[in-house]
Every structure is written in structure tokens, then in C-alpha cells.
Curated annotation (Swiss-Prot):
It comes from Aspergillus fumigatus (strain ATCC MYA-4609 / CBS 101355 / FGSC A1100 / Af293). The gene is helB3. This is Cytochrome P450 monooxygenase helB3. Pfam families: p450. Residues 1-25 form the signal peptide. Belongs to the cytochrome P450 family. InterPro entries: Cyt_P450 (IPR001128), Cyt_P450_E_grp-I (IPR002401), Cyt_P450_sf (IPR036396), Cytochrome_P450_monoxygenase (IPR050121). Induction: Expression is under the control of the secondary metabolism regulator laeA. One of its GO terms (biological process) is helvolic acid biosynthetic process. Its EC number is 1.-.-.-. Glycans are attached at residues 111, 206, 339. Pathway: Mycotoxin biosynthesis. Heme binds at residue 435.
Length: 507
């Protein structure tokens, strides 16, 4: 009887709680006038559910189609779909990052991306900025070339020495190459991932991100006995932490032994000084930044490269334009550098921009919050409301983009709209907290793709499930399915990310 009474009381409490949530959401909330899916008004777990089920991108597009330029995604979180509104928020220090960014912190130590205090964030950015400018990138470029396109060419050329044509998986190969680049730059060590087809480091990154997310949203799973549920994720996390600690110790020992300083990101972190006190970062701060760079940089860059290749294989007219551009500007035996690609390959750059527009690195941004009220699209948004950007919608927004569903790289070559189109791109964020690794990512993407299309003929395999003639209801080539991880990634890369390579045809 006592148990039945207790259960009845429990259900009554839950019913009262539900009634309160409904009444507050529909009649009392200061955001009740803003359009929203019903579940978004009563629970904050809707975006998390979409993320965990891989439906984040689909939901982002559907919500924009249904609710328009502004809507609620959680009871106290507004999503913006107009890139102009997003830029208003992202360009102001008045809108600070929320604690949600702490998901990506190592042991609670902030990194350049997770500081919520604008002053602290700017101080760290001033520490690191000299090492992400073009001059320092030029010093690091030999490492990018060695472990990137040169390693890829060595792998592919070895296969082409035995066969006239070879099928390669461009997702796996470029992914491994990006890990080798990041390992060399961030940890000063060789992963040999591409050479040995070693996916251990890929596992480290994806499992570490998953562990950070799970630990943030469900902290109780770290406690016994539930900790066994995440023991595999925790092991990858611990392995990455140990590797980073060891890498820092090795570098410090090399410096104490009088060996010359390499031009890489690990050395940049060790040399970075507080702009005011001139104090260096602590070993744990260096470790936090290095882990963040590996987790945030390698997978996102390699996934963009994969998407560019995918789109160009679907649109032969743009592929032919890129091939013609690279070969008209550079001889076959020349390795194209970043500065050369920036100066001579505008069409390739436009293709990368257009790919980032069609497939943003993430479907949404994490929220900002302001201590002051703001009016956007005629809606009053009170102080304390979280504001995030629906990147998928912002990159399809009308009238910001003409014919937004069309893959059309020349939109980024129009001089009249040159600055506007780039301002509307939110893949690397915008304003005061744009991605500090943006220039490095662009360097790796441009150099890898430029040399690929200069040196090889590429085509789809005969049994590809995607191609120029395999179209959707609108008559456009279907694109391969996506999934959300560190970035927007191909859902089935083993099946869908295959291309046939052959040696460049010379006239």
C-alpha cells in the first residue's frame, strides 16, 4: 500500500511539473511569441536528441523551412537563420559564449575556443595570433606538404606504378593525412597514420569528443558502476591526454638539450606569452590547447576536403574548370604552395567556399547570451536569452543567397558581391571569436586540392551510387548522406567516398 501511495505521489508531482511547463511555455514565457516546435518550448533536450541520432542537419533545414528566420530550439534558446542577424550577434563582445562551450575543455582548463569571458578570450587570442598569420604558416608549410599532399602522392603513385587506374578512398586517405599533419604540427611527432593506414588516432579524436559530450550532459556516467558504459571512450581520452603530456615533455627536453626550435604549433604554444604580463602558458594550458587543436582541426579539415571532391565529381563542369585552372598556371612537376594557390586559383577557392556553404562544418553554432535585450526580426528577445545560429539555414537563406539550393561556385567570383558572400559564410564563425585556425585550414585545403587536380585525372567508379546523372526530385545530383561528429561527415565513407585515379593526361 505504501509503495502504491508513493508511486501515486510521484506521478502527481510529475503531472504538476508537466502542467507548469506547459502553462509557462504557452502563456508566461517572454519568448512565447517566437515561433517554435512544440517540444522546443517544453524541453531543452530536443537539439541533443537530434545530435545523438545524427539528425541535426536534417532538423536544422526542416525547422528553417517550417518556422522561418527566427524560432526557438529550446525553451530559452533562439535560433537565427538570417546571416545578417547572426553577424550582429557574433560580431559583438556584448554577446558572450555560454557555459555550453565548456564541453570542449580538458579537465576544466579553458582553451582559446571555450573562454566565456571576452577579455580572457581576447588575451589568449593575442597570445596565439602571431602563430596563425601568413608568415608563420609559410614557415610551417614544409610540414604540411610533407605529411599532406606529398605523402598522398607517394601512396597513390605507388599504386599507379602497378596499374593504369586505381580506386582510392579519398575520405580515408585525406583523413589519415590530416592526422599526420596535425600530429606533426601540434605534437611534434610522427603518427605514420597514412603510411600504415592506422586509424587509432581517428578513434582517439572521435571517442574523446564523445566522452567530452557525454561527460558534460550526463556526468553521472563517470561514476561507478555506470562508468563501464563509457570505458572505451574514457580509454581513448586517457591515451590522448598521455600522448600530449609525453609530447610536451619530449619537446621541453629537446629545448633544454639545445636543439633548435621547430616552426610548429607545439612550439608556438610553448613560446606564446601573455600580452600584458609576458608570462608563458602553463604545461596544462599548453596541453589543453593542443588537445583542442587536434580534436577540432584534423577531422573538420579532412571532411571539407572530402566534400569538395564529392561535389566536383557530381558537377563535371566545375571539376573541369578547376583542373584547367590548376594546369594553366602550374607545370606538372611543380608543387603548388598556399600563397601560389591563393594568388592564382580563384575558381578552386570558390569551390571550397561553395562546398562550405552547402555543407557547413556544423549544422548549428553553440549559443551566445547577452545581458541586454535585443530586437531581431521584430521579435523582442530579453536579456539572458541564449542565441545560436542555424548554420544550415543561414547558408540557404533567401534573399541572402540567390538560388541557394544550387551548387554554383561562381557566386563567389562576382566582384560586386565579393565581400557580402564571404560575410554571409559562417563555417568558421564570424567577428570577435572567429576560428583562430581558419588560415591553417585554408592552407591545407587549398594546397591538397590544388595539387590533386593538377596531377591526376579523377572520376567516379562505375558502381558509384552518386553521380551527375543520379538526381533528386529537383533534378540536382544527389549528395551522399551525412552524419554529425566532430564535423559534418559522410555517413558511409567506405561506400560513398571512392574515386578512380589515373596519371594526368598531358598534351
Amino acid at each position: 500500500m505504501a509503495v502504491a501511495t508513493l508511486i501515486s505521489i510521484l506521478f502527481a508531482v510529475l503531472a504538476l511539473r508537466l502542467c507548469y511547463l506547459l502553462i509557462h511555455a504557452l502563456f508566461l514565457s517572454p519568448l512565447r511569441h517566437i515561433p517554435a516546435p512544440f517540444m522546443a518550448r517544453v524541453t531543452s533536450k530536443r537539439p541533443l536528441w537530434h545530435l545523438l541520432t545524427g539528425k541535426a542537419e536534417i532538423a536544422a533545414r526542416q525547422d528553417y523551412s517550417t518556422f522561418g528566420d527566427i524560432y526557438l530550439c529550446k525553451p530559452n534558446t533562439v535560433y537565427l537563420c538570417d546571416p545578417h542577424d547572426a553577424c550582429t550577434v557574433l560580431s559583438s563582445h556584448a554577446f558572450r559564449k555560454t557555459d555550453m562551450y565548456r564541453v570542449f575543455e580538458y579537465e576544466g582548463i579553458p582553451n582559446v575556443s571555450t573562454f566565456t569571458d571576452p577579455a580572457q578570450a581576447q588575451r589568449r587570442r593575442r597570445q596565439l595570433h602571431p602563430f596563425f598569420n601568413n608568415a608563420y604558416l609559410t614557415q610551417m608549410e614544409p610540414v604540411m606538404l610533407k605529411y599532406g599532399i606529398q605523402a598522398l602522392k607517394a601512396r597513390w603513385d605507388a599504386q599507379l606504378a602497378r596499374h593504369k587506374k586505381v580506386e582510392v578512398n579519398y575520405r580515408f586517405d585525406t583523413q589519415l593525412a590530416m592526422f599526420d599533419i596535425t600530429g606533426a604540427l601540434v605534437f611534434g611527432r610522427e603518427f605514420h597514420a597514412l603510411e600504415t593506414s592506422n586509424l587509432v588516432y581517428t578513434k582517439w579524436v572521435n571517442n574523446t569528443l564523445s566522452y567530452m559530450l557525454v561527460s558534460h550532459y550526463f556526468p553521472w556516467v563517470k561514476r561507478v558502476p555506470l562508468s563501464w558504459l563509457v570505458r572505451g571512450l574514457k580509454q581513448s581520452y586517457d591515451d590522448l591526454v598521455a600522448f600530449s603530456q609525453e609530447s610536451i615533455a619530449i619537446r621541453q627536453a629537446d629545448l633544454q638539450a639545445g636543439r633548435p626550435k621547430p616552426a610548429d604549433l607545439l612550439q608556438a604554444l610553448l613560446d606564446a606569452e601573455d600580452p600584458d604580463s609576458k608570462a608563458p602558458m602553463t604545461a596544462r594550458e599548453v596541453q589543453a590547447e593542443s588537445i583542442a587543436m587536434l580534436v577540432g582541426g584534423s577531422e573538420s579539415t579532412s571532411s571539407v576536403i572530402s566534400w569538395v571532391i564529392h561535389f566536383l565529381l557530381l558537377y563535371p563542369e566545375h571539376l573541369q574548370a578547376v583542373v584547367a585552372e590548376t594546369r594553366a598556371n602550374f607545370p606538372a612537376d611543380h608543387t603548388i604552395t598556399f600563397n601560389e594557390s591563393k594568388a592564382n586559383l580563384p575558381y578552386l577557392e570558390a569551390c571550397i567556399y561553395e562546398t562550405l556553404r552547402c555543407i557547413p562544418t556544423a549544422s548549428t553554432s553553440f549559443p551566445r547570451v547577452s545581458d541586454q535585450a535585443i530586437i531581431l526580426k521584430g521579435y523582442y528577445i530579453p536579456a539572458g536569452t541564449e542565441i545560436a545560429t542555424n548554420k544550415c539555414a543561414a547558408h540557404l537563406h533567401q534573399p541572402s543567397w540567390q538560388d541557394p539550393d544550387r551548387f554554383y561556385p561562381p557566386r563567389f567570383l562576382n566582384q560586386e558581391t565579393y565581400h557580402e558572400t564571404r560575410r554571409n559564410m559562417l563555417s568558421f564563425a564570424y567577428g570577435t571569436r572567429f576560428c583562430i585556425g581558419r588560415n591553417l585550414a585554408w592552407a591545407v585545403m587549398m594546397v591538397t586540392l590544388a595539387n590533386l587536380f593538377k596531377d591526376y585525372e579523377v572520376e567516379l567508379p562505375e558502381d558509384s551510387r552518386f553521380g551527375p546523372t543520379i538526381v533528386d526530385a529537383a533534378g540536382r545530383p544527389k549528395i551522399m548522406p551525412t552524419k554529425m561528429g566532430v564535423a559534418t561527415m559522410p555517413a558511409d565513407p567506405e561506400r560513398d567516398c571512392r574515386m578512380v585515379l589515373s596519371v594526368r593526361i598531358t598534351e
